[in-house]
């Protein structure tokens, strides 16, 4: 998988201090794109997705990765970065460029990636991410009307019982 190094990352939102998506105070980066795979597989409209409003209510914008990393590092409250909101692995080059830049600045805080994919569907990006320390990935599609589950790796309650997180490095 040949990846280019990106200077910007396209996001639909940035929350400087998030206390919901991980057991540590985090910067939450709302990724910009989704292929609605979860919805297509079970035959429901994308509007039924818990994240659909993110697409319809917020505009995607390119943000310089280096300045975003500096912004994170200047916040003494946060100790992790969480990618989520839509599908981060549709922006693999940008996510990897962010991780590479953050690690290059000497920061080894946890980076958490919420994906609707299963490990076998994103094996190449996972292989590349394993080169960096402290990467956590939440796997599994959103299933409406599913019982949620507490995930001990993330330290939070997930929306669907088929979802789980793994520390991959």
What are these regions (language model features)?
Residues 77-102, 143-155, 167:
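Conserved glycine-rich "GG(E/T)P / GGGxP" loop and the immediately following alpha-helix
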Residues 54-69, 89-131:
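Canonical radical SAM enzyme core domain
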Residues 133-144:
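Non-cysteine beta-strand/loop elements that form the S-adenosyl-L-methionine
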Residues 161-169:
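Charged phosphate-binding loop/patch that engages nucleotide di/tri-phosphates or the phosphate backbone
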Residues 30, 84, 112-116, 140:
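A cross-family glycoside hydrolase active-site/sugar-binding cleft signature
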Residues 1-15, 137:
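N-terminal "domain-start" segment that seeds a small globular fold
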Residues 6-9, 17-62:
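Canonical Radical SAM [4Fe-4S] cluster-binding loop centered on the CxxxCxxC motif
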């Amino acid at each position: 998988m040949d990846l280019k190094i990106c200077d910007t990352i396209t996001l639909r939102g940035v929350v400087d201090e998030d206390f919901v998506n991980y057991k540590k105070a985090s910067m939450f980066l709302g990724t910009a794109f989704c292929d609605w795979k979860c919805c297509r597989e079970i035959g429901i409209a994308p509007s039924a997705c818990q994240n659909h409003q993110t697409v319809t209510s917020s505009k995607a914008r390119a943000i310089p990765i280096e300045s975003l990393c500096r912004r994170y590092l200047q916040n003494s409250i946060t100790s992790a970065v969480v990618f989520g909101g839509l599908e981060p692995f549709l922006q693999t080059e940008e996510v990897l460029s962010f991780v590479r830049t953050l690690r290059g600045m000497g920061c080894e805080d946890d980076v958490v990636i919420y994906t609707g994919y299963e490990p076998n569907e994103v094996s190449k990006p996972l292989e590349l991410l394993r080169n960096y320390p402290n990467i956590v990935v939440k796997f599994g599609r959103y299933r409406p009307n599913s019982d949620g589950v507490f995930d001990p790796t993330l330290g939070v309650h997930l929306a669907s019982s088929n979802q789980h997180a793994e520390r991959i490095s």
